[in-house]
């Protein structure tokens, strides 16, 4: 199963759910499609990073940097999409708490540890790490190795959201629509903070001795988690509003990128427009989720079955795709002259080959345990 997306069971309850998405006792193809698109966007973003991040994390100055802004300004919605899908399926909790944690943490943590070890071995072959570095990396798995590897930071955040599920579920079961909108409204305000901080570095109680200022508990990915539940319960945006928010958010993101490209030197400063919990990403994510949720096709042909198969293997694809990106970039980057060739071609090759590798691995004994599929 695609446990990156936090699916408890495909036979989940049908209380006030979006009729386009909900088909009791059946896979929801619209969300399978959304998972696969999110996987593609993850890979696209990680391919693109090589073109705007220098080894010292400064902004490079090559002529195609403006084009990178146009090519990459949609991709950061992928992580919020995964979180919204998780909230759609997991909230509110409908099973015993201990059983929930055992199921979730087992299916997430075992593959995570296995792939951390595999990446530690991979780094010996790919970048020349020593055996001592390998053992040091393995020993560092309980600390923060996932972040040091790079893309596995996501797992820590996902586990944190799982820990939140039994806490917020009782409130979600009894709250009114207006109350839910009130929470989401405060959270939406916090998505302006990355831009507010450009003028006011510390607001609403922020200071070095206070790690939890006024709106701290309303910030971050928990808002996307609840937004996924909100769409299930009350429905998605209209197509018209979704398109307006999606196009408007994209153009705003590109504009901020182009403006800051000439004014900042560090990647962290340039990426402010690509922050997952920024207002522009929030609007685009909400809009894109709403659009795809309206797909009525049930995937009843070979292509649809492949989409569902990809969705089932998406957690393992998330782990392995960096290895495939490195392979295809080393193989193809010199033969493809420009960024607008390199990024799409390397992304497509990595996207397809990641699925093939995981599909082959899924045939091995006990693969479900360490692949998370």
What are these regions (language model features)?
Residues 262-272, 326-345:
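Extracellular/periplasmic helix-loop-helix junctions in multi-pass membrane proteins
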Residues 93-99, 170-178, 232-243, 291-306, ...:
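Membrane-interface junctions at the ends of membrane-embedded or membrane-associated helices
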Residues 305-322:
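Helix-helix packing/entry segments at the starts of transmembrane helices
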Residues 1-189, 334-373:
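Membrane-cytosol interface segments of multi-pass membrane proteins
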Residues 237-305:
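Alpha-helical transmembrane segments and terminal signal-anchor/GPI-anchor hydrophobic tails
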Residues 44, 116-117, 185-198, 247-261, ...:
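Aromatic-anchored segments of alpha-helical transmembrane domains
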Residues 50-54, 124-132, 196-202, 259-263, ...:
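Membrane-helix interface motif
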Residues 67-80, 142-157, 195-223, 256-286:
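Interfacial loop-to-helix transition and helix-capping segments at the boundaries
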């Amino acid at each position: 199963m695609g446990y990156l997306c936090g699916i408890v069971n495909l036979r989940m309850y049908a209380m006030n759910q979006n009729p386009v998405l909900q088909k009791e006792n059946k896979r929801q193809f619209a969300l399978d499609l959304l998972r696969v698109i999110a996987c593609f966007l993850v890979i696209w973003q990680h391919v693109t990073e090589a073109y705007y991040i220098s080894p010292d994390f400064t902004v490079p100055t090559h002529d195609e940097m403006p084009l990178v802004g146009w090519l990459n300004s949609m991709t950061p919605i992928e992580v919020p999409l995964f979180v919204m899908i998780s909230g759609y399926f997991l909230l509110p909790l409908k099973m015993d708490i201990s059983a929930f944690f055992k199921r979730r943490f087992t299916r997430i943590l075992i593959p995570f540890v296995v792939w951390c070890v595999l990446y530690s071995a991979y780094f010996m072959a790919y970048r020349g790490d020593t055996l001592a570095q390998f053992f040091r990396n393995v020993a560092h798995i309980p600390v923060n190795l996932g972040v040091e590897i790079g893309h596995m930071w996501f797992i820590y955040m996902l586990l944190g959201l799982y820990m939140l599920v039994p806490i917020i579920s009782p409130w979600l079961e009894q709250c009114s629509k207006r109350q839910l909108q009130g929470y989401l409204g405060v959270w939406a305000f916090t998505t302006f903070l990355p831009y507010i901080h450009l003028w006011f570095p510390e607001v609403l109680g922020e200071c070095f001795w206070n790690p939890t200022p006024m709106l701290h508990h309303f910030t971050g990915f928990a808002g996307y988690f609840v937004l996924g539940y909100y769409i299930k319960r009350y429905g998605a945006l209209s197509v018209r509003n979704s398109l307006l928010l999606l196009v408007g958010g994209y153009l705003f993101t590109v504009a901020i990128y182009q403006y800051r490209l000439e004014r900042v030197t560090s990647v962290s400063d340039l990426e402010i427009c690509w922050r997952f919990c920024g207002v522009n990403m929030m609007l685009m994510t909400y809009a894109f989720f709403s659009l795809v949720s309206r797909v009525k096709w049930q995937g009843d042909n070979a292509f649809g079955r492949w989409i569902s198969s990809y969705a089932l293997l998406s957690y393992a694809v998330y782990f392995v795709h960096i290895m495939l990106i490195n392979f295809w970039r080393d193989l193809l980057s010199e033969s493809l002259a420009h960024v607008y060739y390199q990024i799409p071609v390397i992304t497509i090759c990595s996207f397809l080959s990641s699925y093939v590798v995981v599909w082959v691995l899924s045939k091995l004994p006990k693969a479900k345990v360490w692949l998370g599929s």
